[in-house]
Each structure stands twice: as structure tokens, then as C-alpha cells.
Amino acid sequence: MDNPTDSAGKCPVAHGNTPRSRSNRDWWPDQLNVQILHQNSGRADPLGQAFDYAEEFKKLDLDGLKKDLHALMTDSQDWWPADFGHYGGLFIRMAWHSAGTYRITDGRGGAGAGQQRFAPLNSWPDNVNLDKARRLLWPIKQKYGNRISWADLLILTGNVALESMGFKTFGFAGGRADVWEPEELYWGPEGTWLGDERYSGERGLAEPLGAVQMGLIYVNPEGPNGTPDPLASARDIRETFARMAMNDEETVALIAGGHTFGKTHGAGDPSFVGVDPEGGELEAQGLGWTSKFNTGVGRDAIGSGLEVTWTQTPTQWSNYFFENLFAFEWELTKSPGGAHQWQAKNADASIPDAYDASKRHLPTMLTSDLALRFDPVYEKISRRFLENPDQFADAFARAWFKLTHRDMGPKVRYLGPEVPAEDLIWQDVIPAVDHPLVDDKDIADLKEKVLATGLTVQELVSTAWASASTFRGSDKRGGANGARIRLAPQKDWEVNQPAQLAKVLGVLEGIQKNFNAAQTGAKKISLADLIVLGGAAGVEKAAAAGGHAVSVPFTPGRMDASEAQTDAHSFAALKPRADGFRNYIGGRQFMKPEEALVDRAQLLTLTGPEMTVLVGGLRVLKAGAPEHGVFTSRPETLTNDFFVNLLDMGTQWSPAAGRDGVYEGRDRKTNDVKWTGTRVDLIFGSHSQLRAFAEVYGQADTKEKFVRDFVAAWTKVMNADRFDLV
């Protein structure tokens, strides 16, 4: 057989494993990345498009699975022995780190797709040796197959670990379907592990990031940049946990609850540890961090480099964490691996050894643990938990459930018999449908009533878009269901044009009130439905004005959430700083406008063509800032004029003097200004792939296709949060 690496037989595909393999992004690193719109598109899914995980999960023998997981907890393996004879601490850390990447700023990260299996997360320094945890689980995953996803299994195993050590959990919901390729997420600007170029000014952490250093889940347990300062650590903890949507009480409960179990690993110098899983050789088979320190496992294991066991009963739920935290004064010391940690003064050796029952050690803590005592706010909460163990247990159970379910969206997505009955405000509760829904005749009549009010296409379309486009496919939050656009904070967002919004909502509420009052039975229409229906009426009117008769699909069933069901502070995270679909920029930005457009399109689960057709349609319908990007002489008519005029070689573009981010399109012959546009508008003529999409919609023979595709993409956004329709 010929040598496959001979120059005459080089593979024509660039695999990225030799110096000759340079991607387009290597050549043009600042090029707009549109590929994130097509990741996890389904072509890489070995289960196929027809696979329905929710249906498979219903077939799962959950009791049998949990029984097997309970047995695994104490089935210590020689190749990776269990600390204290119990894998509970390891599996809690695995589940925590699967969920703990979640960040509220953009809803990305979290446990929802099982991304811990893939790079870069599988090789983050903070995830050291979690590859072993997942390998311990493989026989169980192999046994139960497609009825339990890796994403669900990682979290369920953490729950079972807690239960097996005497803790009563709040519940568990399945429903996390696996993906089959790594997500392209912005984890930070650094090019080295544990770099912290993400900070500016006085400890200002860049957004949307949620960790202090590249490759960490939250904070450095030794203290900021390894400086053992508990108060400085508290500042980092408060910031990073808040970015994960946790308040101070939840933060204290999570840290203390998690550190009630298990231990850290720092038996020797980290220099003994080999490369991470993704950088390993073929024969390593995806396992990394092989240690050459003595046996490299068990008592000789090296992970974080810290060597801390927090409690006297590391395989049983207790209140020892707080008892130890406040019982002793603490002195700075170093682990055998050289990491900063703290040791109790004048204490008895009461902490068991993980592998020798005859040995005892002095109590130890991390710098980040001592933050719970020396920060005045955390200290008050910690003392309350010390004195009220039942409150601590309840707070940890609830915070753990929130941690592991935060990115799953509304309860309608929860699966299984262990779903808790209680509604929690962070679940963005929407009332269940409690009345008959409108039928086709009602829908037609309501459309006529909406159009008869004199509300314009622009007003109807922009209001519906504002309501629906808050949806985030990352954590399944936002969307039109609930009609929260009428509540604080959304009703006051500048991007939603509050004065116009109040006018439109007032008119629609009048129609809703009159319709509901006129019914002889219990039939009703919610404002959430009527907002979307009004948008559909506006789109149909605009299409008709352009010579296209279309019917925009509409499915009733949305309900209206109340103020009591809405955490206004939490919803503030959904406020767009930029919305390229509406040509809006407001506030401090952390990406270019065109990058923000693609970012929002990805959150809306749109493809490149869907994003393109929506921008073109929304521009001519004047759904956003009216002064830029409206490349048409017949606004509020659904046409492909945006693309026709953008691609017109009779127009020459140049930056507008004194107007940052604004461009003027001038007639090449007369030099008269024809249009003004933004970076978001011009990117569809500048970026080669987006231009290819734009050219399709700018062709003379695709006017009908443009309208048809716009309606389809519009409907997709309007229904993005209709999990009841899936």
C-alpha cells in the first residue's frame, strides 16, 4: 500500500494537521464567521433526522438506570480508583462542570447538549480528569443506549451521586438531546490556558464571559490569579456566579453543598501530568492528563494541584463544611503540588484519608471557601446555614436543581417522573391554556379587525418582531409566548420603540377585550397570540401590496404571563444591545454590528439564508431604525428591493462624514446620495457568502421565492418558543 503521506498522494481536503493546511480563517482571521449558523445542522447526527429523543426517553427504565448508577458509585476500578471508596464527589463535579459553563448574558454554555464530551471543554484545565468520570459511565450508557442522552446522563449521575450519599435532591428532568459536534462559542480572547486577558480597568470582566480565566468554570480556587486573598476571591465569586444567574444565597449554598463531598487532588507537582485529552496520541483513546507521579492514580492523583478534603464525612451529607469553616482560624500553606491552600490552626487531625482508613488529616480549605466566611454578605448567609442545617439543605437542593436545569427553558420541555410540581420563577412560567382556542373563522375576522384599526404594516410587524425575537435557542428563554413585551423591562427597551409599542398594544388589547367579551362560551384569544396574529396580518398586507397573495401560518395557543410570574431582573439579560434585524445599536458593545447580527441569528436558530431573507424583508417593511437600510421607493411593501438596490453597481458606497458606522450610497454618475446604510446592511454585499445569498434574492426570477422564504423564516421566529408544537 502506498504511504498516504507521500506528496504525490496528498489528501485534497485540508484536515488542519500539517503546516500546509490553512483554513480561510487562518488567512483572514477577521472575516465574519457565518458558519456558526450551520453548526449541528443534522448532517453529523448519526441517529438521523427522524430520531425523536423525547419519545425514546419515555421508554427509559429510569428506576433500573438509577439502580445501576447507585451500584457504580462504590464499584471502584483499579485504573481510576474511587476516593474513599465512592465516586460521588467525582460525579458531582462532572455534573456541576457540565452545567456550570452556563452564562446568562447570552444563554450559552450549560448542560443542555452534553458539550463536555467535546473540545474545548473536554480539555479545559478545570475539567481535569473528568474524562475518567465519563469513561466510568460508558458501560451504563452503552446498556441504555439512545433512551438516555449523554447530556441527561451527566446530570442524572450527579443527582444519583448526591442521593447515594444521603442528600434529598429537588428533582430531575430529562430532555437534553445530544449534539454531535463541538459548538463554536466565544470563551475568551486568550491563546493560552488560564490566561486572563479578559479583564480591563479595575477587574472589569469582559462580556459575555462567565469565568475569570480561560479554561476555568468560575473562579481560581487559589484566589485571583493564584493570589490567596479570600476577600478578593469573594469579588470574583460574586461576579461569576451572578453571570450564571445565581444570587448570593444560591452561591453560598452551591459552594458549600458541593464541597461537602469528596476531595481535590494535588499529590505531586503538576509537571508530572501529561497532555489533555484533545492533545493526546491515538493510543490514549481520548484519555488525557496521564500522570507519571508514582502510580498516577488514587492516592497519587494530580488534578487541580490542590489537596483538600473539606469534611469529616466526605461521602455523606452533613453540615461539617460550615462547622469547620467557623470552628477554626486558618493559616496559609501549600499542597504537596505547590498550590496555595489553607490549614486549620490548633486543630485535631479529624479528616479521613481517601485510601488509608488508619490515617487522619488536619481540616483544609480553599481560598474560595474562606470567601464565604470573610465576605460580610456571604458570612451572614453562611452563619444562618450553620445554625439552620435544614435551610442549608433546602437552599442547596433548589440551587443544584437550578444549576443543572437553568438552560432547559420552560417546564413544558421537562421529561420524566421526577419533575418537581412547584413552579419556579426562573423557569419563566407561562400559564397553561385554560380555554378553547380561536378557529380559522375567528382568525380571519381578527385579522380584519386589526387592519381596520389603521395600524400600519410597520407598526404591526415591528411589534410582533419585538415580541418574538427575544427568543434564545441557547437557553430556550424569551419569545412571544407570555406576551412579556407588555411588562417591565421589555416594554421600556429603546429598541422596542416604547411610545409606538404602547400605542399598538393599547389597540390590540382593545380588540382582545371586545372579542373575548363577545364570546358565548369560554373561547378567548390571548394578547400573546394577537400580537403574533397582528404581525401576520401586516406581512400579508405588505405581500399583497407587492402582488403576492400569501397566508402567513398562525397557530394559537400562547398565553399571557403575569408580573408575578416574571423576574424583571432576570429578563434584563435578554435586552438586545444590538439587533441587526432592526438596524439597532444601543449601549456598550462587545462585538462589531455585523457580528452581533450573526450572533442574534444564531440565538434565533436561523440559517444563513433565513437571516438574509429576514433582514431584506424587515428593511423594506421599516421594522427597525427607519433612516438606514430602507433601500426601496415603496416602503411597507414586501419586495426584494433591498437586495436589488444593494447589489446595483450604479451605486458607490463610502463612509458618511461624521457619522460613525453609517455609509452613503451615491449614484456613480450624479454623485447624489440615494441611500444610507449601516455595516449590517453593507455586509450582505461585502461578505462573499452573504453576497451569494443576497444575489439569489436579488434575482428577477426569485421575487416570489423571496416572499415565500420570508414568510417561512418569519413563522419560524414567531413559533420559536412553541415547544408545545414540537
From Swiss-Prot:
The keyword Oxidoreductase applies. There is a cross-link at Y218-M244 (Tryptophyl-tyrosyl-methioninium (Tyr-Met) (with W-96)). The record marks R93 as: Transition state stabilizer. The active site is at H97 (proton acceptor). Gene3D superfamilies: 1.10.520.10, Peroxidase, domain 2 (1.10.420.10). The lineage of its organism: Bacteria, Pseudomonadati, Pseudomonadota, Alphaproteobacteria, Hyphomicrobiales. Its EC number is 1.11.1.21. Its cofactor is heme b. CDD domains: catalase_peroxidase_1, catalase_peroxidase_2. GO terms for biological process: cellular response to hydrogen peroxide; hydrogen peroxide catabolic process. PANTHER family: CATALASE-PEROXIDASE, HYDROPEROXIDASE I, BIFUNCTIONAL CATALASE-PEROXIDASE. It catalyses: H2O2 + AH2 = A + 2 H2O; 2 H2O2 = O2 + 2 H2O. Keywords: Heme, Hydrogen peroxide, Iron, Metal-binding, Oxidoreductase, Peroxidase, Plasmid, Signal. GO terms for cellular component: cytosol. Disulfide bonds: none annotated. Binds 1 heme b (iron(II)-protoporphyrin IX) group per dimer. This is Catalase-peroxidase. Homodimer or homotetramer. There is a cross-link at W96-Y218 (Tryptophyl-tyrosyl-methioninium (Trp-Tyr) (with M-244)). Belongs to the peroxidase family. Peroxidase/catalase subfamily. Residues 1-16 form the signal peptide. The keyword Nucleotidyltransferase does not apply. Bifunctional enzyme with both catalase and broad-spectrum peroxidase activity. InterPro entries: Catalase_peroxidase, Haem_peroxidase, Haem_peroxidase_sf, Peroxidases_AS, Peroxidases_heam-ligand_BS. Heme b binds at H259.
